[in-house]
């Protein structure tokens, strides 16, 4: 019997792996590891899931960043992806604005300081594309404050960016003391008292 390690976030759609109810192919069994990313609270089997896979090839299978995967393939890394997408998010629901930043519509983000987990995070890549394609926002004219190290090195020529740990948003409210004026992050449940980018969500509602 061959055992394959599979590193996952403990999300509801991954529950069958942790409950042992996934039918593995004959001769194979899965060892599901609960591994978080970045500096999130530690999971049962640690953190830094993406880095441990890209850098150390620690797991047989790993829930991974699509954007970083595409970058790695462009550099001839020998990873193979399966067309399974456990997270399907609209970026518009994950953009939160400083209430004092005078941001009334997406185009107002031009010239503003926007905090992101990392520049190549899949949600950040999606958000940049949505801002440009849906609202005509040239994301190259935004000052990006990066909260965490990049999983893969990249060339930042022509992009205004800086590492800014202070870009991390507090869970309750946002004051002018924050180093950023907008933040893009997928953990929406923690920010119930922080408004999203005005007018950014409504055009996307109702889409499949």
Predicted features, each with a name:
Residues 160-208:
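Pocket-lining segment of extracytoplasmic ligand-binding domains
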Residues 1-5:
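Extreme N-terminal starter segment of soluble prokaryotic enzymes
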Residues 9-140, 144-153:
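Short, glycine-/small- and polar/acidic-enriched structural segments
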């Amino acid at each position: 019997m061959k055992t394959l390690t599979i590193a996952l976030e403990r999300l509801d759609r991954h529950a069958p792996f942790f409950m042992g109810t996934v039918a593995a192919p004959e001769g194979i069994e899965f060892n599901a590891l609960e591994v978080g990313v970045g500096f999130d609270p530690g999971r049962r089997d640690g953190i830094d899931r993406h880095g441990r896979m890209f850098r150390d090839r620690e797991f047989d299978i790993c829930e991974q960043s699509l954007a970083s995967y595409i970058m790695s393939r462009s550099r001839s890394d020998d990873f193979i992806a399966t067309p399974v997408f456990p997270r399907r998010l609209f970026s518009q629901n994950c953009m939160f604005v400083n209430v004092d930043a005078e941001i009334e519509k997406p185009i107002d983000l031009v010239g503003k300081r926007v905090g992101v987990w990392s520049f190549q995070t899949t949600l950040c890549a999606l958000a940049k594309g949505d801002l440009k394609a849906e609202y005509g926002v040239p994301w190259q004219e935004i000052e990006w404050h990066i909260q965490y190290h990049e999983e893969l090195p990249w060339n930042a020529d022509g992009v205004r960016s800086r590492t800014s740990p202070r870009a991390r948003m507090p869970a309750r409210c946002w004051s002018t003391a924050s180093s950023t004026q907008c933040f893009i992050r997928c953990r929406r449940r923690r920010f119930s008292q922080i408004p999203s980018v005005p007018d950014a969500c409504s055009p996307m509602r109702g889409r499949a």
